[in-house]
Amino acid sequence: MVSSDYFSTGDGHQLYWERHGTPGGEPIFFLHGGPGGCSDRRHLEFFDGRCFDIILFDQRGCGRSVPHGELQYNDTGRCVEDIEALRQHLGFGTISMLGVSWGSWLAIQYQQRYPEAVLKTTLVSVFVPFAANVSAYDQTLNGGLSATAHGAYAVSAGAIYQILNNGCATQQRQAALHWLRATLQLSGQSMQPSALEEFVDDEALRAIRLELHYHVNQYFFTTADEAPSLDAQTEVIQGISDTFGMASVRWLRRRQPLRCRLLNAGHNAFELAILKTVRQSLKREHLR
């Protein structure tokens, strides 16, 4: 690691950031998934550190940013402005971006607002929160919650969110466990009950609540977001088994031509097919 610090947004949030790779290399911002996720050293696997000046940072309320899980002044627009503020703070003229899952939408939004500041953009396991996609995702989530209810009374994402905001400590913990069991099952993953119980601490509760804060607000998608324009240096890397990612790609393609590499993979960007393709793509684009 070259350096790390906190950056004040000026409205109560402190964003944790780290700098890796080679100072003077091509500056690239990694935009993590979620909402409510975080950056991690494992994300460095996407990059050749000899070529890139890599910035990892935790979005508002995420990871090591503080206050953790804070909902006030936490929306898509402010997260996009944070990218620009960090770019200026770190002294970069232009930046490339690698956006994964939710981070891909932030990268698209940043490119709309600050096209002159963008060198290249790579979108991986894309998620675009247009109305039909969010509705389908919500139905899938609610179906998963119903299937794993086992007597629980919260069988919708909205109900889980209300409990996490207003329930007692016991209710919040049970709601979080229910949410995680459902989302793990939907993603084809599993955890031992004892491991799941241990995982659900106060930090996990706040992260789930933040994720649902975005979900119940339709990810703050507006009519102005209906017609994004991506530049020619934007590349999409997408697994074909990722239902909502493929819906997002089709939505983007209806609006403009798209450089897109479709892979026999799902949503997880650490699947070997996706990871290798991202590394190769970033290296190839860097050499241009």
Segments from the language model and where they lie:
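The serine-hydrolase catalytic nucleophile loop
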Residues: 35-48
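Alpha/beta-hydrolase
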Residues: 142-226
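Conserved alpha/beta-hydrolase
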Residues: 49-67
